[in-house]
UniProtKB/Swiss-Prot annotation:
The lineage of its organism: Bacteria, Pseudomonadati, Pseudomonadota, Gammaproteobacteria, Enterobacterales. Pfam families: DarP. Keywords: Cytoplasm, Ribosome biogenesis, RNA-binding, rRNA-binding. It is found in: Cytoplasm. Coiled coil: none annotated. This is Dual-action ribosomal maturation protein DarP. Member of a network of 50S ribosomal subunit biogenesis factors which assembles along the 30S-50S interface, preventing incorrect 23S rRNA structures from forming. Promotes peptidyl transferase center (PTC) maturation. Belongs to the DarP family. The gene is darP. InterPro entries: DarP, DarP_sf. It comes from Proteus mirabilis (strain HI4320).
Length: 186
């Protein structure tokens, strides 16, 4: 049999002249090993955050049954078993769309931050009530129509007396609790 010349494929009209490497580059998306490890570590961290949630908070997160059972098991076990279980949860999270889970976690965190902001606003309002006069009381009554002016004035007066006499701030706390109850009922 005759040996074909090395440039034979250039002479053959049926041969596709495009290099094979270019075709493969279009189809294959190359991901580095480090990136895969970073993604796995991020999923493990997400799994740890899920394990740290309470049962009521877990109900608000969209999880399948197998993942939820694994999280509940991880909450029960200790030390090395917990680490292995979190690793397993990370593996399960690879097969699940993580975006809805992350969104639910963000909502839970933001809700907590919003509650803290409301408490800070109430503390500022309490301080303004004690330091201010009738204008601040009118502002509170306008903000919370079900507020009792007489009770507000009594709590403010008692808080001022306690502050002047250097007594424990019982009325100070009662005033805050009253404002908190008003904000929750509004």
């Amino acid at each position: 049999m005759a040996k074909q010349p090395e440039e034979w494929h250039y002479l053959n009209p049926e041969f596709d002249n495009t290099p094979l490497e270019e075709e493969e580059e279009e189809e294959i998306i190359w991901v580095s090993k480090s990136e895969i490890k970073r993604d796995a570590e991020a999923l493990k961290k997400l799994g740890t955050e899920l394990v740290e949630l309470s049962a009521q908070e877990l109900e608000r997160v969209p999880l399948d049954e197998k993942l939820l059972a694994s999280i509940k098991l991880a909450q029960k076990v200790q030390r090395e078993a917990r680490r292995r279980q979190i690793q397993y949860i990370g593996k399960l999270l690879r097969n699940v769309d993580e975006e809805p889970i992350r969104q639910a976690l963000d909502k839970l965190k933001n809700r907590h931050n919003q509650q803290i902001l409301v408490l800070h606003k109430l503390e500022d309002l309490r301080t303004r009530l004690i330091d201010g006069g009738n204008e601040v009381i009118e502002e509170v009554v306008a903000l919370y129509p079900m507020a009792d002016r007489q009770q507000l004035r009594t709590l403010i007066r008692n808080a001022k007396k306690e502050k002047e006499a250097n007594k424990p701030p019982k009325s100070f706390r009662l005033l805050f609790q009253y404002l908190k109850d008003l904000s929750e009922s509004a």
